[in-house]
Amino acid sequence: RETWESGAGGAGGLLTATGFACSASSALTVTIGAGGVGNQGGGTPYTGTDGSNSVFSTITAIGGGAGGKYYLSGFDGGSGGGCGGHTTTAGDIGGSATAGQGHDGGTNVNTGSRDGGSGGGGAGSAGSSNSGIHAGDGGAGLQSSINGTSTYYCAGGAGSPGYPSGSYGDDGIGLVNAANRGHGGTTNEPVNGSSGVVIIRYLS
């Protein structure tokens, strides 16, 4: 499947809260957001989709922004998607992050028409911009031990190479092919983002 010159998906938003009041008699809304669908192959600028929001009661983590395919800018989200590289306009932008939840996607900084895509933003850092035909890296995830094991969540995906001989970017630190991590979709297979997660820790 062709994925030339595409920006990568941004991670879902990462939020934490302590001292949340609840009772056994009160129902709470919990929604696990689906990961975004990756950019489609082929020679048309069909972009992927944003991830869906994850919700715990009044706390909403915004789904990750889709990466821009070819000449499209990245899309906004919890973390922003990376910009596509098939453009002659330096400064085309990555998607913007939601304040307090993540970082922006990488921006196109070149003027070639077949440059690599930029990386998606992560909870720990922004996605990096392309470098000519070489794609940008995904933003880093953040580690948490809330589940008893140190685990990375919400890393950004890697951009795809410029045509015909560029290189892929690196996935954001901590990105693995696993569900319920909130990672952005990478342009290396698999391209879809991972689903979100809600983790509740309480005193017994």
Question: Which ranges hold each PLM region?
Answer:
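Low-complexity, glycine/proline-biased repetitive segments and flexible coils/loops
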Residues: R1-S204
